[in-house]
Amino acid sequence: NNNEDENENVSDSSNENRRFWEASVPGGHYMVALDRISNISIHEYALDGAVVVHEVTIDTNGRALARFYYLQPISETMNRNEVARVVDKGRQLIDRAGQRLGTNVADMVQKTYPATTHAGTIEYRLQDIRDLDALYGSLRKAWESGKGRKITIQ
């Protein structure tokens, strides 16, 4: 997909440092040498029957696996108004908790110890599926061309 043109939250450009692909996203910054990338993927899966995970992974010759993902409640894939209202109420509660803590909880990776705590995994959560598509497009373009790129997602 070439959605970066439609999404004003995304800036994707050639990187002055030609050896690297960089991503600045809410919640952090990731940088990898293009010659260290062994594979990239974009895929989706259902998690615990409640959430569809749209995910980009970057595997490297080092010890770290990078994951960029967007979470979509399964209710959004269905036409069920009642379920959607419950999900929206849950989101409001999470947002209010984050405001009290002074943190944007929506941008934070959600983990359950120890089931989702993986050594060597770097994770970033995105809030818009278009941002994930733009990120994958930038990554793929850099890896295929061997020319560094930098993407910034607001």
Regions found by a protein language model. Give the residues of each.
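Eukaryotic intrinsically disordered, low-complexity regulatory linkers and tails enriched in Ser/Thr/Pro
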Residues: 1-154
